[in-house]
Design a protein with these regions (language model features):
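Hydrolase active-site cap/lid region
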Residues: 19-25, 157-206
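N-terminal cap/lid segment of alpha/beta-hydrolase-fold proteins
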Residues: 20-64
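Active-site glycine-rich loops that stabilize anionic/oxyanionic intermediates
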Residues: 67, 74-78
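Structural cue for short, hydrophobic secondary-structure segments
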Residues: 72-75, 98
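Conserved alpha/beta-hydrolase
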Residues: 89-108
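Alpha/beta-hydrolase active-site loop
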Residues: 111-137
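Glycine-rich nucleophile elbow surrounding the catalytic serine of serine-hydrolase chemistry
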Residues: 146-157
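Serine-hydrolase catalytic core
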Residues: 209-279, 284-286
Length: 289
């Protein structure tokens, strides 16, 4: 989404100020003790959604389960999948589910923003299914949803209606609903430049969907429905911080008191702040256990 974020500068206020970074969590750089009976492992899964099965990989934590779970959503198109973060979260004792939306990175079906949201719901349903939670050692009562960029947008809109989540975190969230305010030609060009090779759609179809949905895709409008959600919002110097700040302000104005925020002076992908990213998320997650 790196080619899109500059457009947010046209629709937003100045960026937030950075705070001091947290101490690097030991799980970022320390392997867990090898558990012969219950070793860390990977599992390939196929998640039913919209009449197809989307691709997923589970990073199962070491030790006797059930383990708390993070469902990690990638961005648009998803070049940065934050798998280093997934590994760090696993070392911290969380089992992490990663997946590819319909029509992206080999998952079958057409790509659309509506399908993104439906796919997130499908992954959560998969994790809560007793057959899968038992096989993978998941604790269905302790599922946290998180995402980067577009994945942060999907996280906000999903958490707004899924009250069974233990929490949610957003990393440099891209509020794609704001792009409905751009001229259609400008939105098409931005989407095309962002990289379409891995997506089963066209920039024209994506732009038309955004324009048709309008405010329904603006995550700031979800603020009143997030007041009871434990939420971590991480922003960066990518132009998108003001819309994330607006979401936080809206939640707090509506009475929400469980929002944690942090801002890092790095790019949209946190390219030079990977250890800080993992430490921010792990530190916040430790308080949910």
């Amino acid at each position: 989404m790196r080619h899109l974020v500059w457009l947010l500068l046209l629709l937003a206020a100045p960026p937030a100020l950075a705070k001091s970074p947290p101490r690097v969590d030991s799980a970022v750089y320390t392997d867990p003790v090898h558990d012969l009976a219950h070793p860390a492992r990977m599992a390939v899964i196929h998640i039913p959604s919209g009449g197809v099965e989307i691709n997923g990989v589970v990073y199962v934590a070491a030790g006797t389960g059930p383990h708390p779970v993070v469902v990690l959503c990638h961005g648009l198109p998803g070049n940065e999948k934050n798998l280093d973060l997934a590994q760090a979260l696993r070392r911290a004792g969380w089992t992490v589910i990663t997946f590819n939306y319909r029509g992206s990175w080999g998952s079958p079906g057409p790509y659309s923003f509506a399908n993104d949201l439906a796919d997130v719901d499908a992954v959560l349903a998969y994790a809560r299914d007793p057959a899968h939670s038992q096989t993978l050692g998941l604790d269905p009562g302790r599922i946290v949803l998180g995402g980067h960029s577009l994945g942060g947008w999907a996280t906000a809109l999903t958490a707004a209606h899924d009250k069974g989540l233990a929490g949610a975190f957003m990393i440099s969230p891209g509020n794609i609903g704001r792009f409905a305010k751009l001229p259609r030609a400008g939105a098409i060009e931005a989407l095309r430049n962002n990289g379409m090779e891995s997506l089963a759609t066209t920039p024209e179809a994506m732009a038309d969907e955004l324009i048709a949905k309008g405010e329904a895709y603006d995550f700031v409008t979800a603020a009143p429905r997030l007041t009871g959600t434990r939420l971590l919002v991480l922003t960066s110097d990518d132009g998108g911080a003001p819309t994330a700040d607006a979401l936080v302000a809206g939640i707090r104005a509506a009475g929400g008191k469980s929002v944690t925020t942090a801002h890092a002076p790095t790019d949209h992908s946190w390219s030079d702040a990977r250890l800080r990213l993992a430490s921010e998320v792990i530190g916040w997650l430790r308080a949910t256990r």
